[in-house]
């Protein structure tokens, strides 16, 4: 600064725009050690993968038809969403229900 007030030329001495045509190398050249396993248990906590906890079962109401008399059957099941999907696949294939009346009379 050469006077009582600074000027823009004194503050900004040299600015050049970045050349956007030159590629920037973003690769990491870090090399890992030969051992695949690292023992990082200094705090006494094991960081091993634990199996996922199963979802809590929920109740589902299923309305279906008797395969003999076409009567309405209402079922209530308690299962996880995954098991309910399996049951749905059985319904779409060969599983059929028989109502209590048809089961005892035929």
Curated annotation (Swiss-Prot):
This is Protein E7. Coiled coil: none annotated. GO terms for molecular function: DNA binding; DNA-binding transcription factor activity; protein domain specific binding; zinc ion binding. Plays a role in viral genome replication by driving entry of quiescent cells into the cell cycle. Stimulation of progression from G1 to S phase allows the virus to efficiently use the cellular DNA replicating machinery to achieve viral genome replication. E7 protein has both transforming and trans-activating activities. Induces the disassembly of the E2F1 transcription factor from RB1, with subsequent transcriptional activation of E2F1-regulated S-phase genes. Interferes with host histone deacetylation mediated by HDAC1 and HDAC2, leading to transcription activation. It comes from Human papillomavirus 45. It is found in: Host cytoplasm; Host nucleus. GO terms for cellular component: host cell cytoplasm; host cell nucleus. Its main location: host cell.
